[in-house]
Design a protein with these regions (language model features):
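Hot-dog-fold acyl-thioester-processing enzymes
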Residues: 1-96, 157-161
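HotDog/MaoC-like acyl-thioester-processing domains
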Residues: 1-17, 96, 101-161
Length: 161
């Protein structure tokens, strides 16, 4: 985690800018990665455990093959994510996630994902940030995307217990 701490500038809601991008991540989809994910998800369907070239991966593999990587977005903006700052670190709790699939991910694909800040907003005094992760294959076809929303600040006076 120390690699993510680039300075003491905290990536708080007021400095987050929509459009901020993180780094790209490219991964090969192999029979082994499909089987490992299926096993980890406790889905022992032979379709995934014994997948061969050209066969489909589980749809939810998008969350492993295209992880959120908020830390890289914070770093690209010159800040440190709140979860890893040295003093007074804190979580930004999950609020919701919406995923959309456009094409299947298959054994033999090369998947590249990139995340960016989609929007930030205030709702009833609480402050939210939505991130979008987009996944494309080796043909530059978008295979999936998901929006992941976190609560950066709770409304003042809200009882959190």
């Amino acid at each position: 985690m120390r690699d993510y701490i680039i300075n003491d500038k905290r990536w708080e809601w007021d400095v987050i800018e929509p459009g901020t991008k993180g780094d790209e991540l490219t991964l090969e989809i192999t029979s082994e990665t499909v089987a490992t994910y299926a096993s980890d998800a406790r889905n022992f369907n032979p379709r995934y455990i014994d997948a061969s070239e050209g066969e489909f991966a589980m749809p939810t593999t998008i969350f492993r093959e295209g992880p959120l990587r908020r830390h890289s977005m914070a770093q690209s903006a010159g800040y440190t994510a709140l979860e890893v700052v040295e003093e007074n670190s804190r979580q930004t709790p999950f609020a919701k996630c919406t995923a959309r699939w456009f094409k299947p991910i298959k054994v033999g694909d090369t998947i590249t994902s990139c995340a960016h800040v989609l929007e930030k907003y205030d709702k009833r005094g609480s402050k939210f940030v939505t991130f979008r992760v987009e996944l494309t294959n080796q043909d530059q076809d978008k295979v999936a995307e998901y929006d992941y929303t976190c609560i950066f600040e709770y409304a003042k006076g809200q009882n959190l217990s």
